[in-house]
């Protein structure tokens, strides 16, 4: 089956993406550049796989994703013999949330003093920075680091803007620190998950049923948008566009 035919049959439904992803994985398409993608996450992320595979194929890549065991970050990064490196990734995605990395910043923010908030931000920055550095010690893979979406519910509610250190500001400061970490490491980039969620809307992003079933913080439409956006980042990082300038020196063009 031709790739064009496979992609043409994708109608936007999760089932059509799943079928197309399977056919792409089983087929041989010379026009697609192979890319192994390793994913480290603190939440259930593998449902994004079919969307990532199909949207990457639209952009000329045959992505083979590997999803590390749930919430295993350091275990995969620091062990050079881990399944992550055995998969020989060209791209490593670190998909984490503050809910898992720094629960106090989300769950009990109003009980924290300003120094506590600064400490939590520093701890997250140090941990993610350590992951990026650890990957670089064992691999030359491109690293994409998810930044953090605003919390769906502010601990102080309407009073958040009146806090000396607001929860909104704390999340943004954490994202700023992640950006600094990525700037300091060659081949590391921020995946702007926060913007993706904000543009789509918090209430539309999550499906409570999926969260309670399997700690999946994204509904099916959010999974599609994440897979599509990730494919764009991977394409830009691994195969940057080239520009050609044609100069007419003898009036023959």
What is each PLM-predicted segment?
Residues 243-253:
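Asp-based phosphoryl-transfer active-site loop
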Residues 38-45, 49:
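Extended, charged helical/alpha-beta scaffold domains that provide interaction surfaces
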Residues 1-31:
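Short N-terminal or domain-adjacent regulatory/targeting segments
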Residues 1-3, 37, 251:
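Generic low-polarity alpha-helical segments
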Residues 39-40, 146, 248:
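Short hydrophobic segments within beta-strands
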Residues 2, 25-35, 49-54, 58-221, ...:
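Alpha-helical cap/lid subdomain in secreted, periplasmic
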């Amino acid at each position: 089956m031709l790739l064009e035919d496979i992609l043409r049959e994708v109608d936007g439904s999760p089932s059509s993406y799943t079928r197309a992803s399977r056919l792409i994985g089983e087929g041989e398409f010379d026009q697609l550049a192979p890319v192994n993608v390793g994913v480290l996450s603190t939440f259930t992320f593998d449902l994004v796989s079919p969307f990532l595979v199909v949207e990457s194929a639209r952009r000329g890549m045959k992505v083979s994703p590997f999803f590390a065991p749930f919430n295993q970050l350091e275990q995969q990064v620091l062990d050079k013999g881990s399944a992550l490196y055995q998969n020989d990734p060209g791209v490593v995605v670190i998909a984490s949330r503050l809910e898992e990395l720094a629960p106090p910043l989300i769950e009990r923010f109003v009980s924290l003093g300003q120094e506590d908030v600064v400490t939590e931000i520093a701890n997250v920055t140090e941990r993610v920075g350590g992951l990026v550095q650890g990957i670089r010690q064992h691999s030359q893979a491109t690293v994409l680091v998810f930044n953090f979406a605003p919390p769906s519910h502010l601990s102080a509610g309407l009073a958040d803007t009146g806090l000396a250190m607001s929860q909104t500001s704390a999340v943004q400061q954490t994202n700023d620190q992640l950006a600094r970490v990525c700037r300091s490491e060659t081949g590391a980039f921020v995946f702007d998950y926060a913007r993706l969620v904000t543009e789509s809307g918090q209430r539309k992003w999550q499906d409570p049923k999926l969260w309670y079933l399997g700690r999946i913080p994204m509904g099916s439409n959010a999974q599609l948008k994440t897979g599509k956006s990730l494919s764009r980042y991977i394409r830009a990082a691994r195969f940057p566009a080239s520009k050609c300038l044609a100069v007419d020196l003898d009036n023959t063009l």
